[in-house]
Swiss-Prot record:
GO terms for biological process: calcium-mediated signaling; immune response; neutrophil chemotaxis; phospholipase C-activating angiotensin-activated signaling pathway; positive regulation of cytosolic calcium ion concentration; regulation of vasoconstriction. This is Type-1 angiotensin II receptor A. C-terminal Ser or Thr residues may be phosphorylated. A lipid is attached at C361 (S-palmitoyl cysteine). It is found in: Cell membrane. Glycans are attached at N3, N18, N177. It holds the Pfam family 7tm_1. The gene is agtr1-a. The chain crosses the membrane at residues 27-56, 63-90, 100-126, 143-166, 192-217, 239-267, 278-303. Disulfide bonds join C19-C273, C102-C181.
Length: 362
């Protein structure tokens, strides 16, 4: 069992008796809590710095900074629950924190999954609009639209997390006196639970990733048509977002695979204890890999974002925002020529210069 456990009440005897040792390995109970604790410390520090830098220095004036701010907040809300999961795993999957915290900590996982993937999708669409359709997109690529989009993302992610709020609860195995935090459901709800698990695979990963992949493919094609020197001016934020997306993919794909295997177990397609053990052992490991996404994002911002590095150094040197130099995201002098060329190449060049002046927030 793990923090992704499911318990079908009509099937407890099979789980508790026939496959009672699945996933119960000493190295899991030692290594996983250490990893969770490390992610907690690094994630809280890193994402807190991102929130402070963007809010205090960058003032959330651009579309990208608003999305990145919400991404950091999502990661921060999630990583603060990791000490609970670390203790839960260290105690051999025994949950002593009560039903309320079981629901809250579980909901934070699902909420983080959906908000992260939706925000990354919006970032890729924003980059696509800014680079491929720079003139037309200026109408809707505003801070207000970005804020409303983020509100919508949080609402949709919260609705997608409702099964955790409703079905996640503590369950006592009387024969072992073990209290677990798991999704508990009647056999009549099996197809609903399977549907929710598949939604994580399809809505929470596959569809958004296809949108992201398409967006960046079209962006790459467009960038080939402009001058290399001009492209370099837009590389900072482009490289950073691509890195964030790739990190998300490689961190979450193992978890998505094991979630699908868990669906097959729930549907009785897989019916042997060896596979139960593989899934129950692999699930906390893949969850750890997925959780690394929440603590590594801030370091990507610092590595790829020149302005972010500058503001971060100002922060750790205790330089107040009002005293900082004013070479900020909106103060670069425009290089746009006074007249537009009739050719497509010149039009794109000018548009990208304008975009860089407005959007170079990193």
């Amino acid at each position: 069992m793990s923090n992704a456990s499911t318990v079908e009440t009509s099937d407890v005897e099979r789980i508790a008796v026939n496959c009672s040792k699945s996933g119960m390995h000493n190295y899991i109970f030692i290594a996983i809590p250490i990893i969770y604790s490390t992610i907690f410390v690094v994630g809280v520090f890193g994402n807190s710095m991102v929130v402070i830098v963007i809010y205090s220095y960058m003032k959330m004036k651009t579309v990208a900074s608003i999305f990145l701010m919400n991404l950091a907040l999502s990661d921060l809300c999630f990583v603060i629950t990791l000490p609970l999961w670390a203790a839960y795993t260290a105690m051999h999957y025994h949950w002593p924190f009560g039903n309320f915290l079981c629901k809250v900590a579980s909901t934070a996982i699902t909420l983080n999954l959906y908000t992260t993937v939706f925000l990354l999708t919006c970032l890729s669409i924003d980059r696509y609009s800014a680079i491929v359709h720079p003139m037309k997109s200026r109408i809707w690529r505003t801070a207000m639209v970005a804020r409303l989009t983020c509100v919508g993302i949080w609402l949709v992610a919260f609705l997608a997390s409702m099964p955790s709020i409703i079905y996640r609860q503590i369950y006592l195995f009387h024969d072992t006196n073990q209290t677990v935090c798991a999704i508990v459901y009647d056999s009549g709800h099996i197809y609903f639970m399977v549907g929710m698990s598949l939604a994580k695979n399809i809505v929470g990963f596959l569809i958004p990733f296809l949108i992201i992949l398409t967006s960046y493919t079209l962006i790459g094609k467009t960038l080939k048509e402009v001058y290399r020197a001009q492209r370099a001016r837009n590389d900072d934020i482009f490289k950073m977002i691509v890195a964030v997306v790739l990190l998300f993919f490689f961190c979450w794909i193992p978890y998505q695979v094991f979630t699908f295997l868990d669906v097959l177990i729930q549907m009785d397609v897989i019916q042997n204890c060896k596979m139960y053990d593989i899934v129950d052992t692999g699930m906390p490991i893949t969850i750890c890999i997925a959780y690394f996404n929440s603590c590594l994002n801030p370091f990507l911002y610092g590595f790829f974002g020149k302005n972010f590095r500058k503001h971060f150094l100002q922060l750790i040197k205790y330089i107040p925002p009002k005293m900082r130099t004013h070479a900020s995201v909106n103060t670069k002098s425009s290089l746009v020529s006074s007249s537009l060329s009739d050719t497509k190449r010149a039009s794109k060049k000018i548009a990208l210069q304008m975009t860089d002046n407005e959007e170079h927030c990193k």
